[in-house]
Amino acid sequence: MRIALAGAGAFGEKHLDGLKNIDGVEIVSIISRKAEQAAEVAAKYGAKHSGTDLSEALARDDVDAVILCTPTQMHAEQAIACMNAGKHVQVEIPLADSWADAEAVMKKSQETGLVCMVGHTRRFNPSHQYIHNKIVAGELAIQQMDVQTYFFRRKNMNAKGEPRSWTDHLLWHHAAHTVDLFAYQAGKIVQANAVQGPIHPELGIAMDMSIQLKSETGAICTLSLSFNNDGPLGTFFRYICDNGTWIARYDDLVTGKEEPVDVSKVDVSMNGIELQDREFIAAIREGREPNSSVARVLDCYRVLGELEVQLEKQG
């Protein structure tokens, strides 16, 4: 499987590290905004080509599939371009920053029949897989998910502390993880409410947000998001269930009493991003729909679109 990766930033390298562990995968092309960065990352991971324009990679006959780790605002347009070029595509979360764009990607996926997968990593983290397996087996049901997504990002920096060329978003990026995961674990979302704090004068985004969700099963989700939190960074999920409580921190899982849970045997790796990439490659090879295909995550973007309308009305 011959791969091109666009967006050689902090998250792009996480994908490249995961892809190294998958048999038969070759990194052919690295595309990034800066030519020097693209060339440097290409050399590090053994890619024969680097450049600054996605169209260069899409024109290559030796590229089977593309992974997009580019700025949020480019995701939908680039995913469609990949499929128009006959390439399978995995687009990092979020699929789009509008409901209309998400629908457009879905339509193109249906037209082409190509694998179009979205990077909803929480579906693949061993911690969340552990809970999902118990739900599917009928061993527990979620009563409430309590989720905190906290960062300290008053300046436009990426995960490496480097300046970003684009602006992150609590609703369309960070909330997308939890909205999709809640539906994946507890059923279709039938009610959603949101409020947000003041808009940052320079970044032009809300720095604090609160979201409430309810699923068709009656489960509820309380999600707090902030770019103002000066403390432990990341997203932490508390699963309050009818048969126990668990806290998931990325790939790790503990009980509600902070007792470690062994999730090392849940899947072939403890790395959620690697597992996500393994699913992408396997779906292409096996000619099947992947977990977190655009079709399977689309409803998340319907909910985000509805929440955006609510927030706009609030002013």
Curated annotation (Swiss-Prot):
GO terms for molecular function: 4-carboxy-2-hydroxymuconate semialdehyde hemiacetal dehydrogenase activity; nucleotide binding. InterPro entries: Gfo/Idh/MocA-like_OxRdtase_N, Gfo/Idh/MocA_oxidrdct_glycsds, LigC_C, NAD(P)-bd_dom_sf. Optimum pH is 8. Keywords: NAD, NADP, Oxidoreductase. Gene3D superfamilies: Dihydrodipicolinate Reductase, domain 2 (3.30.360.10), NAD(P)-binding Rossmann-like Domain (3.40.50.720). PANTHER family: BCDNA.GH03377. This is 4-carboxy-2-hydroxymuconate-6-semialdehyde dehydrogenase. It comes from Sphingobium sp. (strain NBRC 103272 / SYK-6).
